[in-house]
């Protein structure tokens, strides 16, 4: 897998994290505010650890190898549960590719832990009508 493909996904995760702040600023509910912050922290912490571990294996990228931020797009949504689902699904391709490389088993475990945390967040979003999203 190319560094540029990996960096695309990592930086899209940061965009999803920022999108949670957009939801945070537009909601009145205390539960929704707390969930937005929790989800944002989950995504940011994961993206950082994913980058550190992945680039530890592939080698430190040059600045020019990284994705140009103005070229990135995500499917925006104002539904926090749906945002969790999208931010979780985006790493599926990494898991599939990294699962083929024995030395990246730690990254596969990291991805699995993240996906589990996001599933929990989606469930917690169902309380107090923070999200109407129904998982597939």
Predicted regions mapped to residue ranges:
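Acidic/histidine-rich alpha-helical segments that form the ligand environment
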Residues: 69-122
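Helix-loop segments that flank and shape redox-cofactor active sites
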Residues: 15-38, 97-105
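Long amphipathic alpha-helical segments
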Residues: 56-60, 124-136
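A structural signal for well-ordered alpha-helices, especially hydrophobic packing surfaces
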Residues: 6, 17-24, 47, 51-54, ...
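Disorder-to-helix initiation segments
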Residues: 1-10, 16, 76-83, 87
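Short amphipathic alpha-helical segments with heptad-repeat character
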Residues: 7-10, 14, 37, 44, ...
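Conserved alpha-helical segments that form or flank metal/cofactor-binding pockets of metalloenzymes
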Residues: 31-64
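Charge-dense, intrinsically disordered terminal/linker segments
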Residues: 1-6, 109, 134-136
């Amino acid at each position: 897998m190319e560094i540029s493909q990996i960096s695309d996904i990592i930086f899209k995760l940061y965009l999803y994290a920022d999108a949670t702040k957009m939801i945070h600023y537009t909601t009145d509910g205390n539960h929704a505010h707390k969930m937005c912050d929790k989800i944002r922290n989950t995504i940011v912490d994961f993206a950082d650890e994913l980058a550190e571990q992945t680039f530890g294996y592939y080698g430190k990228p040059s600045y020019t190898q990284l994705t140009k931020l103005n070229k990135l797009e995500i499917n925006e949504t104002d539904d926090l549960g749906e945002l969790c689902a999208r931010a979780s699904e985006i790493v599926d391709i990494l898991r599939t590719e990294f699962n083929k490389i024995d030395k990246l088993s730690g990254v596969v475990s990291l991805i699995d832990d993240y996906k589990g945390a996001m599933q929990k967040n989606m469930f917690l979003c169902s309380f107090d009508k923070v999200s109407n999203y129904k998982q597939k």
